[in-house]
């Protein structure tokens, strides 16, 4: 097993429900360390840039509108197999298909307002972390 870093967003729907602490507690109780974190209001340009890979898909406009509808929490998580572990904690993208006890099953409203985002690969994690954090903003604990 390897120590990895992964990127996480607590999305506007979860921030609005005031469950930031409940979600981060799940990360920490599963052995992930939060090594960078900030709350921010994404601009339209930031959201479009972050989700650029989806720009040709029909849901892109709605995704950007949702991600700019309120503040988000962007975080870097570190731990053994952090990418896979975070994805397991989040549950399926569609909360109706997410296993009981996962973040999305417990806190998400819909496939669009699904509480959290997590990197799906090492390459994505590196790209996503660099998009929001300078190297000097990420620490080791």
Curated annotation (Swiss-Prot):
It comes from the Bacteria. Homotetramer. GO terms for molecular function: ATP binding; metal ion binding; nucleoside diphosphate kinase activity. It comes from Pseudomonas putida (strain W619). Keywords: ATP-binding, Cytoplasm, Kinase, Magnesium, Metal-binding, Nucleotide metabolism, Nucleotide-binding, Phosphoprotein, Transferase. It is an enzyme of class 2 (transferase). One of its GO terms (cellular component) is cytoplasm. Belongs to the NDK family. Its cofactor is Mg(2+). SMART domains: NDK. GO terms for biological process: CTP biosynthetic process; GTP biosynthetic process; UTP biosynthetic process. It is found in: Cytoplasm. InterPro entries: NDK-like_dom, NDK-like_dom_sf, Nucleoside_diP_kinase, Nucleoside_diP_kinase_AS. Pfam families: NDK. This is Nucleoside diphosphate kinase. The active site is at 117 (pros-phosphohistidine intermediate). Major role in the synthesis of nucleoside triphosphates other than ATP. The ATP gamma phosphate is transferred to the NDP beta phosphate via a ping-pong mechanism, using a phosphorylated active-site intermediate. The keyword Transferase applies. It catalyses: a 2'-deoxyribonucleoside 5'-diphosphate + ATP = a 2'-deoxyribonucleoside 5'-triphosphate + ADP; a ribonucleoside 5'-diphosphate + ATP = a ribonucleoside 5'-triphosphate + ADP. ATP binds at residues 11, 59, 87, 93, 104, 114. Its EC number is 2.7.4.6.
């Amino acid at each position: 097993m390897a120590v990895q870093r992964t990127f996480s967003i607590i999305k506007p729907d979860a921030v609005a429900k005031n469950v930031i602490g409940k979600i981060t507690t799940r990360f920490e109780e599963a052995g992930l360390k939060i090594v960078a974190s900030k709350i921010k209001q994404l601009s339209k340009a930031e959201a479009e840039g972050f989700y650029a890979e989806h720009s040709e898909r029909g849901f892109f406009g709605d995704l950007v509108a949702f991600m700019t509808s309120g503040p988000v929490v962007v975080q870097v998580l570190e731990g053994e197999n952090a990418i896979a572990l975070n994805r397991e904690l989040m549950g399926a993208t569609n909360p109706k298909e997410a296993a009981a006890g996962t973040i999305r099953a417990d806190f998400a409203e819909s496939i669009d307002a699904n509480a959290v985002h997590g990197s799906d690969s090492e390459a994505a994690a590196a790209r996503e972390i660099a998009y929001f954090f300078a190297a000097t903003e990420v620490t080791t604990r």
